[in-house]
Amino acid sequence: MKIIALETSAVTASVAVTEDERLLAQSFQNSGLTHSATLMPMAADLLKNTGLTLDGMDVVAVASGPGSFTGVRIGVPAAKGLAWPGDKPCAPCSTLEAMAWQCAHVGGEICAAMDARRNQVYCARFRAENGALTRLTPDRAMGLDELADEVRASGLPQTLVGDGAHLVQRALEGLGLPCALMPPHLLYQTAWGVARCALRMAREGQLVSAAAMAPSYHRLSQAERELLSAEKRTAR
């Protein structure tokens, strides 16, 4: 099964092509340019350089959130655009699960976390065994104190991954809870992780049409929160 995967949920952008568990190629960019300017040229160049075509892809996958509202709003429509012409099935992947797949080989409990600001993280916890993941919690936004309580209750060391991993590390180590960061090349979001998540979804019959694919924000954007607050003040 060939999968083309897009990752734009944070400051970096990446595109990967895989065949089953095997990574065929990946392009990663952290240049400061906007994802809207870099993503589609990256995808086109990756396919050209590998001698593959979009028609030859079986699945189009994308990190659908949580993450940067702007980034997710770029990635999901881009994936739809790739999928629609050939009516390709799509995998709207949890950004957190995709990151956890990057350390599934480590084993034990994994905490995938992204900085949600205001002393909160988007996070989910998984258990890795024999290269496979079992989800322990849903994706959610929560405070670091609440997450620390949950980890303490588990009683097990945590492998930390994601751009919020350093925040979680400080919170856990401050309470004497054992944890370890993934190395830099596996710490942040990658399209390869998205492709691994998509493969799991495909094998479990969880693919959707391009029309049905939607972002998963888990929280209102700042602009939406400010608008809601203003509407509440006006209604008083």
Question: Which residues are covered by each model-predicted region?
Answer:
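DPxDG-like acidic metal-binding loop motif
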Residues: 61-90
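Surface "functional belts" at beta-alpha junctions
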Residues: 22, 34, 89-189, 217, ...
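Phosphate-handling active-site elements
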Residues: 48-55, 84-93
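Stable alpha-helical structural segments in soluble proteins, enriched in small hydrophobic residues
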Residues: 46-50, 85, 103, 194-202
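N-terminal beta-alpha supersecondary unit
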Residues: 1-66, 188
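Glycine-rich phosphate-binding/hydrolytic loop that grips phosphoryl groups
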Residues: 184-217
